[in-house]
Amino acid sequence: MLVHPEAMSVGALADKIRKIENWPQKGILFHDITPVLQSAEYFRLLVDLLVYRYMDQKIDIVAGLDARGFIIGAALAYHLNVGFVPIRKKGKLPFETVSQSYALEYGEAAVEIHTDAVKPGSRVLLVDDLVATGGTMLAGLELIRKLGGEIVEAAAILEFTDLQGGKNIRASGAPLFTLLQNEGCMKG
């Protein structure tokens, strides 16, 4: 049974996200979603809020970004009765892959997807836990496009608006939906 979004507010999710100062480094206020995932009530709320948004949007596949996007994306795909595709850090997938690099604060990283994961013309929803600079999500969107997928939307629980990731994603031509927006993960 779905929890109707009006039964609990999105603000309840915000209250459940744990804030940890100076982690993983000094000056960062880390937003930890594990309390949401640990609670059957709040995890259901999170998934149901997304199900209600996407249940009538004719999605063919949900893709999730490594690693928390797997948790949210797989649960969402199950409820939408569609398949799930993992987009993993480079070197973690066993079959033929296509890769996309993206910039980090110091250096570069890459994500990969199996070459047969998205059929041309498939309508794809890309999911992650949060959007900071947007680099990982932009790389995931590019992988889906390389395989011929049509981006329905990119979705996340939380967007740090001051880091411009959401703006960059929207500028790439992909719509972005986030349940919560926050000024940022940098301590002021």
From Swiss-Prot:
The keyword Glycosyltransferase applies. GO terms for molecular function: adenine binding; adenine phosphoribosyltransferase activity; AMP binding. It catalyses: AMP + diphosphate = 5-phospho-alpha-D-ribose 1-diphosphate + adenine. GO terms for cellular component: cytoplasm. Its main location: cytoplasm. PROSITE patterns: PUR_PYR_PR_TRANSFER (PS00103). GO terms for biological process: adenine salvage; AMP salvage; purine ribonucleoside salvage. CDD domains: PRTases_typeI. Keywords: Cytoplasm, Glycosyltransferase, Purine salvage, Transferase. It comes from the Bacteria. InterPro entries: Ade_phspho_trans, PRibTrfase_dom, PRTase-like, UPRTase/APRTase. It is found in: Cytoplasm. Pathway: Purine metabolism; AMP biosynthesis via salvage pathway; AMP from adenine: step 1/1. Its EC number is 2.4.2.7. It is an enzyme of class 2 (transferase). Belongs to the purine/pyrimidine phosphoribosyltransferase family. Homodimer. Catalyzes a salvage reaction resulting in the formation of AMP, that is energically less costly than de novo synthesis. This is Adenine phosphoribosyltransferase.
